[in-house]
């Protein structure tokens, strides 16, 4: 199991958990009252459960030459979206950043 903190405008908003490469969970912090991660992931008390890597996070990953460079330099498997997100998570476009919990 791997975990990451999800920040919105620098405030911890949620936790992303990879149970295995086919099972993911996104839990908002119980006292979080700020903006949602995205329109498709509004703030709620119950966790979101996914049977694949969450689309929002897949959508912020690099593509093309940038992806190939990331995979090569960080020695990441192309199918390991969680590791890709951890590699670029603090430098995403927009208000969301992601940092691995070690």
Predicted stretch roles:
Residues 1-102:
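Phosphate/dinucleotide-binding and metal-coordinating scaffold of catalytic cores
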């Amino acid at each position: 199991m791997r975990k990451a903190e999800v920040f919105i405008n620098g405030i911890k908003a949620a936790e992303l958990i990879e149970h295995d490469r086919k099972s993911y969970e996104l839990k908002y912090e119980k006292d979080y009252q700020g903006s949602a991660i995205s329109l498709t992931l509004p703030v709620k008390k119950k966790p979101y459960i996914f049977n694949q890597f969450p689309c929002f996070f897949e959508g912020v990953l690099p593509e093309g030459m940038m992806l190939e460079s990331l995979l090569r330099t960080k020695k990441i498997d192309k199918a390991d979206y969680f590791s890709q997100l951890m590699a670029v998570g603090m430098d995403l476009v927009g208000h969301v950043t992601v940092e691995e919990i070690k």
